[in-house]
Regions:
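Class I SAM-dependent methyltransferase Rossmann-like catalytic core
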Residues: 1-19
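Conserved alpha-helix/loop element of class I SAM-dependent methyltransferases that forms part
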Residues: 17-33, 50
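Class I SAM-dependent methyltransferase SAM/SAH-binding core
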Residues: 38-40, 44-92
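A short acidic, Gly/Pro-enriched loop at the edge of an enzyme's catalytic core
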Residues: 91-102
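A short SAM/SAH-binding and catalytic strip from SAM-dependent methyltransferases
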Residues: 101-114
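A short glycine-rich, Lys/Arg-flanked "PGG" loop and its adjoining helix->strand segment in the class I
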Residues: 116-131
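Conserved catalytic/acceptor-binding region of the Class I
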Residues: 133-202
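Conserved Class I S-adenosyl-L-methionine
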Residues: 186-262
Length: 262
């Protein structure tokens, strides 16, 4: 698996912002005291820690493929005594069958060459009366105002790179189909969105994407593999900052969501 975004500070900045409230509200009612939860692809662990606070005293486990990110998650969660972080492989989870009440993954399947296989493995470690809960964005459904033609170029570039890396940037719309292919028959599909429209939210969202387009793994791959020149990437960054500075700027990120019962 290639994680297209990489782990530049501009990427982790957005990951650290994520909580149950803004990223897992669709399954929040399952995070009750005593529930055993596995957070797959946990990144720096802010959602994981939020879950841990809700299910205490039960321990929560967060896994990620990146050892560096797991080390950071452990540092950031120091003082939280009911959370464990470990490196792990979503295709070969190191847990017995029927181990968890909730197996959760946020923005993970879009980066995997075999999302159906990952869902099958998540299903294996889920208890018979538990759920597998997945949320992924749908890049083709991103919507913004005002029109900024260079952002159209940015979106096409990112989707091209993500697919070159074996992922599916429009994963949100495929989640239900992938769940059915993985053998789930009882699936609750929903959708929700992040909206960035206040001056503060626009500045945060625009700046992190501007930084990504000049400094993250996406930018490095774009130059290395001739998807874009440095000048083109800098123009994309400038377009993000123009959008963020516009008093009427508005950006919506659509997410598909599924709650699957084994």
């Amino acid at each position: 698996m290639t994680y297209t975004h990489g782990h530049h500070e501009s990427v982790l900045r957005s990951h650290r912002w994520r909580t149950v409230e803004n990223s897992a509200a669709y399954v929040a009612s399952r995070f009750v005291p005593g529930a055993r939860v596995l957070d797959v692809g946990c990144g720096p662990g802010t959602i994981t820690v939020d879950i841990a606070n809700r299910v205490a005293p039960r321990r929560v486990i967060g896994i990620d493929a990146s050892a560096d990110v797991i080390d950071q998650a452990r540092r950031d969660a120091s003082g939280v005594d009911n959370v464990d972080f470990a490196t792990g492989d979503v295709y070969a989870l190191d847990f017995p069958d029927s181990s968890f009440d909730v197996v959760h993954a946020h923005q993970v399947l879009q980066h995997l060459p075999d999302p159906v296989g990952a869902l099958r493995e998540m299903r294996r470690v889920c208890k018979p009366d538990g759920v597998v809960a997945v949320r992924d964005s749908d890049y083709a459904a991103f919507t913004w105002y005002p029109d900024e033609p260079t952002l159209d170029v940015w979106l096409a570039l990112y989707r091209n790179i993500a697919r070159t890396n074996g992922g599916e940037p429009d994963a949100g719309r495929f989640l239900l189909a992938w769940a059915h292919a993985a053998g789930f028959s009882d699936v609750e599909p929903t959708a929700s969105a992040w909206c960035f429209a206040t001056p503060e939210d626009r500045a945060w969202w625009g700046d992190l994407w501007a930084d990504r387009m000049t400094s993250s793994a996406v930018a490095k791959q774009a130059e290395r593999d001739n998807f874009a020149t440095r000048a083109e990437l800098e123009e994309m960054a400038a377009a993000w900052r123009r959008w963020a500075a516009h008093p009427d700027g508005w950006f919506a990120v659509l997410h598909g969501e599924i709650i699957c019962r084994p």
